[in-house]
Amino acid sequence: MSDEQSAAQPSRIETEQLLREMNDEWVKALVRRDEATLERLMSEDFFFTYPLEGDDRTQFISDVTSGDLIVEHITRHQLGVRVFGNTAVLTSRDSAKWIYRGREIEGQYKVIQVYSERDNQWQLVAVQACPIA
């Protein structure tokens, strides 16, 4: 590999930092109901599985922007990032309060987020949030 090719590839640490920043941006966009940011960060084939149901990208963004799903707060702890080529897995322990169609959901969750690099751009492709004691 030439020096020019090496310079073009971000280091593992740079990639992990980028994904942490994207994760922060995604959480902020949820709280703000920022449709444009959610659409930019989430892949077309995104899927979210959480305690009440599962949603694809279109339904999830619609729920957030319509107010059917209100994210009052999410605090991430123990955020870990592992990069495997063009796939990355982020894990965290979240303290969160959501209101879904009038039903308040508050607690601690173990969250797994999967990112994929497509056409030199990282996107969020899947999230699973599981309640923990």
Roles of regions detected by a PLM:
Residues 2-133:
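A beta-strand edge to alpha-helix "cap/lid" segment located at domain peripheries
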